């Protein structure tokens, strides 16, 4: 499940990973 380019939506440190 991806949100803003990351595996956790957009609230994670991997937001754009």
Curated annotation (Swiss-Prot):
One of its GO terms (cellular component) is extracellular region. The modification Pyrrolidone carboxylic acid is found at residue 1. Expressed by the skin glands. It is found in: Secreted. Keywords: Pyrrolidone carboxylic acid, Secreted. This is Novel peptide 2. The lineage of its organism: Eukaryota, Metazoa, Chordata, Craniata, Vertebrata.
